[in-house]
């Protein structure tokens, strides 16, 4: 659950008040998260985060670069930027440095092989960010864009900026500029007032866009939010049925898209080894850390000696709706 993961990662002491050298790396030794901001200025009517975490605040640019250098010195090869709204980074500072500058600077740190950014708010994704992701070989061609819904009525009720039409155009623009891009989203079904027509619009949208990755959750009331007071509520039974419909559609889409990887080769990082299956669990740039996007299971009959954290070449040999299967090959 990517949202639960973010809340876990974002729920600790403000890192810009910490000495980064006191930090403990609790993830895999070769992969780490870097929180670039605190709080949120978006007032989505289902979310209590702005009430809990306060207004959006970017961490100073040089503080982030220093911490990223420290992580690289500790052996971290992949750095994933996180925040409640990463696209807003730097807009509250007077440094003239924004998300694209942060991606660029971190990617140039010796030892860093890949930089990834999560949680991009749709209407704040600038051409500069798209171009940096497109043109920088050390930035993952991966857009995590939580859109939440596709009915304009529900988007308005959620207090989400932008419309379904805007989102369709944005995704088309990204895919035109970066043909091999991976686009992930999250959706909420059962938001108060969601009716059959609203849900049909969401279904049609999912079938049209064909996201590479999609997570869907049922709405849950949060006290002190506008959504908490909205009526009529959608029943738990209806919400679960709608969730299952979306997931069934996405499973078919994912199965088809995953099979298109077969026969292709990629660079991938080794996360772990499954001794029972005699396979390595690896990720290429299309797979975020912490099992968010499923797995790539790779055999090693190449004769190469490999270790956890190594970057290897793989060839995809098979696929299903959730996972890919590969073999490690020589360059």
Regions picked out by a protein language model, each given a short descriptive name:
Residues 73-199, 207-208:
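Conserved SAM/AdoMet-binding glycine-rich loop
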Residues 44, 64, 81, 117, ...:
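Conserved, mostly hydrophobic/aromatic
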Residues 1-89, 128, 143, 165-176, ...:
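Proteins enriched for Cys/Gly/acidic motifs involved in redox and nucleic-acid/cofactor modification
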Residues 90-107, 111, 157-158, 221-252:
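Radical SAM enzyme [4Fe-4S]-AdoMet core and its adjacent flexible, acidic
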Residues 10-12, 97-99, 133-135, 202, ...:
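Short, hinge-like loop/turn segments at secondary-structure boundaries
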Residues 229-331:
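Terminal RNA-binding accessory module
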Residues 77, 113, 212, 217, ...:
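Short acidic/polar active-site loop segments enriched in Thr and Asp
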């Amino acid at each position: 659950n990517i949202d639960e993961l973010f809340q876990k990662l974002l729920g600790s002491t403000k890192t810009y008040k910490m000495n980064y050298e006191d930090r403990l790396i609790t993830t895999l030794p070769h992969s780490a998260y870097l929180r670039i901001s605190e709080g949120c200025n978006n007032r989505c009517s289902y979310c209590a985060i702005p009430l809990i975490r306060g207004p959006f605040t970017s961490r100073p640019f040089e503080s982030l670069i220093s911490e990223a250098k420290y992580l690289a010195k500790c052996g971290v090869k992949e750095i994933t930027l996180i925040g409640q709204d990463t696209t807003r980074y730097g807009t509250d500072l007077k440094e003239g440095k924004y998300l694209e500058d942060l991606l660029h600077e971190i990617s140039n740190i010796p030892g860093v092989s890949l930089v990834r950014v999560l949680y991009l708010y749709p209407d704040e994704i600038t051409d500069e960010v798209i171009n940096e992701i497109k043109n920088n070989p050390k930035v993952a061609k991966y857009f995590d864009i939580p859109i939440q819904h596709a009915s304009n009525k529900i988007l308005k009720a959620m207090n989400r900026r932008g419309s379904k039409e805007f989102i369709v155009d944005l995704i088309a623009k990204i895919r035109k500029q970066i043909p091999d891009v991976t686009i992930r989203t999250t959706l909420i079904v059962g938001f108060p007032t969601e009716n059959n027509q609203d849900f049909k619009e969401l279904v049609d949208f999912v079938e049209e866009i064909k996201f590479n990755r999609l997570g869907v959750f049922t709405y849950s009331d949060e006290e002190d939010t506008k959504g908490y007071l909205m009526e009529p509520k959608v029943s738990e039974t209806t919400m679960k049925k709608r969730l299952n419909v979306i997931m069934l559609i996405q499973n078919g889409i994912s199965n088809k898209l995953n099979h298109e990887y077969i026969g292709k080769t990629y660079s991938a990082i080794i996360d772990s080894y499954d001794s029972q299956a005699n396979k390595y669990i690896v990720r290429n740039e299309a797979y975020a850390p912490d099992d968010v996007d499923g797995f790539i299971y790779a055999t090693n009959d190449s004769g190469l000696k490999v270790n956890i954290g190594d970057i290897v070449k793989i060839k995809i040999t098979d696929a299903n709706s959730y996972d890919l299967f590969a073999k490690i090959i020589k360059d």
